[in-house]
Amino acid sequence: MKLRANRVGEQMKKELGDIISRKIKDPRVGFVTVTDVQVSGDLQIATVYISVLGDEEQKENTLKGLAKAKGFIRSEIGQRIRLRKTPEISFEFDESIGYGHRIDTLLHQINKDGKREE
């Protein structure tokens, strides 16, 4: 069952990217990238992880715009993917990009400190 949830998640990720970039006309929704979609084992709930280009205010406005368009997005997913029941969608920010950048910065700093000691 987990394999099917992963396949549905990947298909939803592809379709959501298209829907958000082409179909949503809300000016609050700017440069959004769908980074991951986690679907529950029973295919009832989908958590969509997004990254947004901009400051914190733009991120919050984008989240509000996506929440407002949630019904439309869900109906579009239902038309594009053949499932018995379209999963409930929730949007969350993907913090892994910032976390990865912080780790990269720390590794570069450690590398510089190591070269100074030699």
Swiss-Prot record:
Pfam families (UniProt xref): RBFA
Keywords for the protein's UniProt record, in alphabetical order: Cytoplasm, Ribosome biogenesis
Principal place of residence: cytoplasm
PROSITE patterns from the UniProt entry: RBFA
Keyword Cytoplasm recorded: yes
Any one GO molecular-function label of the UniProt entry: ribosomal small subunit binding
Any one GO BP annotation for this protein: maturation of SSU-rRNA
GO CC annotation: cytosol
Signal peptide: none
Compartment(s) of residence: Cytoplasm
UniProt keyword Hydrolase present: no
Gene3D superfamilies the record matches: 3.30.300.20
InterPro entries in the record: KH_dom-like_a/b (IPR015946), RbfA (IPR000238), RbfA_dom_sf (IPR023799), Ribosome-bd_factorA_CS (IPR020053)
HAMAP family documented for this protein: RbfA
SUBUNIT field: Monomer. Binds 30S ribosomal subunits, but not 50S ribosomal subunits or 70S ribosomes.
Family note: Belongs to the RbfA family.
Function: One of several proteins that assist in the late maturation steps of the functional core of the 30S ribosomal subunit. Associates with free 30S ribosomal subunits (but not with 30S subunits that are part of 70S ribosomes or polysomes). Required for efficient processing of 16S rRNA. May interact with the 5'-terminal helix region of 16S rRNA.
Classification via PANTHER family: RIBOSOME-BINDING FACTOR A, CHLOROPLASTIC-RELATED
Name the record gives this protein: Ribosome-binding factor A
Organism this protein belongs to: Bacillus thuringiensis (strain Al Hakam)
Gene: rbfA
